[in-house]
Design a protein with these regions (language model features):
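Active-site and donor-binding regions of nucleotide-sugar-utilizing enzymes
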Residues: 33-192
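C-terminal amphipathic helix plus adjacent low-complexity
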Residues: 1-4, 24, 337-384
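Donor nucleotide-activated moiety binding/catalytic core segment of transferases
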Residues: 81-97, 253-297
Length: 384
């Protein structure tokens, strides 16, 4: 970056911080929501389903979505505002309710009559988190997470185990609403037309089955942890089921900054990283391959098979730490391509479902498909 650019952003940051302090004295708009998904991502995740429930009810609220890219498409009446623009500071300062999916600092000096809600971007994860992760997280992230917890009025939880974790490791001792995640409501209320629409948007034939690969992020550029042999996998699935299959790859959002893993893309191996809604991709998929991501629990709500491709499990355990219960999940661990193919060949639907039901009880699953309704009910009482 050129010196001129560095100076520009330093000055701009100073101006933003000045605006944060000045806008603190502006009145709060009792009908305004500000929603933010993953620090400026497109229309998706739980805020999308909260917004759609508000719109469905015809509630007279001003819905503002903070984005990094103004070309993102949003339904009316949602207003897009550039996250890095001074206008976003104004929207945050004057909003009654602020909803985020990521823990971290934003350009806000919170007022007593504002309500700050955290809806996690995933269910409970296998990796060590927050205070539990210790020195594996950088100081900037830890400070941002502590700030986020200090201003939060409500955390949303999807399981009893997640609630326990939040209150133990997240530097948070406030209220936790145990209702499930709005983004997972879709798994309880979809129709065949929903599946058909999404497949059309993705570019997948209606009569083809889908295996979705959604790995978590690593702080390294090696392609080795993600090296699934797609040809062998698709052949094994076709032999197991007698159906035609397509492999979809969905990269973690952080891969944008580090470069995502490479596959030999074709009409049977498709990159869907830019598709805005991960839950819709899960909905149309018949098999999920993941690793240490909480996506496995989202997908399991539909009782469809999950396989864990954990080629680097020992290295990842040393780098980030993995919780003890992770090694008890009912999903097959596959440390290489041979084990992945064998797991597909040996899959037994009845035994798998029984194991999943038992694990649901262990971690206290709270998903019922009504999270959006419950949260908007709560927000209506706050907006009065």
């Amino acid at each position: 970056m050129r010196i001129k650019d560095i100076l520009y952003w330093r000055v701009y940051y100073k101006i933003l911080q000045l605006c944060v302090r000045l806008f603190y004295y502006l009145p709060v708009n009792k009908h305004k929501f500000v929603l933010m998904h993953d620090f400026g991502n497109a229309y998706g995740d739980s805020p999308k389903f909260i917004a759609e429930e508000i719109i469905r009810r015809g509630l007279p609220y001003d819905l503002v979505w903070l984005v990094n890219n103004m070309s993102y498409s949003f339904p009316k009446p949602i207003r897009k505002v550039k996250l890095s623009h001074i206008k976003s500071v104004y929207e945050l300062a004057t909003a009654k309710v602020i909803i985020t999916t990521m823990k971290g600092r934003c350009n806000l000096k919170k007022k007593k009559n504002q309500f700050f809600m955290y809806v996690p971007h995933g269910q409970i994860g296998a990796k060590f988190v927050e205070r539990q992760a210790g020195t594996t997280l950088n100081t900037e992230y830890i400070n941002g997470s502590k700030w986020h917890s200090s201003v939060s009025d409500l955390f949303i939880s999807s399981s009893k185990l997640f609630t326990e974790e939040m209150l133990t490791w997240y530097w948070y001792d406030g209220e936790v609403m145990e209702c499930g995640l709005p983004r997972n409501d879709i798994f309880f209320h979809y129709t065949p037309n929903d599946v058909k629409r999404i497949k059309t948007e993705v570019g997948v034939p209606e009569n083809v089955k889908i295996v979705l690969y959604g790995p978590t992020f690593r702080n390294e550029k090696s392609n080795d942890p993600y090296a699934i042999d797609t040809d062998r996998l698709l052949t094994a699935l076709e032999q197991k089921t007698g159906d035609k299959w397509i492999f979809l790859f969905r990269a973690h959002p952080n891969f944008v900054w580090y470069g995502k893993p490479a596959f030999d893309y074709s009409d049977k191996v498709i990159d869907v990283t830019n598709y805005p809604d991960m839950q819709e991709l899960l909905l149309i998929s018949d098999v999920l391959i993941s690793d240490y991501s909480s996506t496995m629990f989202d997908f399991n709500l539909m009782h469809r098979p999950v396989f864990l491709f954990t080629k680097d499990i020992e290295a990842y355990q040393k780098m980030r730490g993995l919780k003890d219960w992770y090694f008890k999940v009912p999903f097959p661990f596959c440390h290489n391509n041979d084990e992945l193919i064998q797991a597909v060949q040996n899959y037994d639907e009845q035994k798998y479902h029984e194991a999943c039901k038992s694990f649901d009880k262990f971690y206290g699953n709270l998903e019922t498909g009504t999270a959006s309704q419950q949260i908007v009910n709560r927000l209506e009482t706050i907006m009065r």
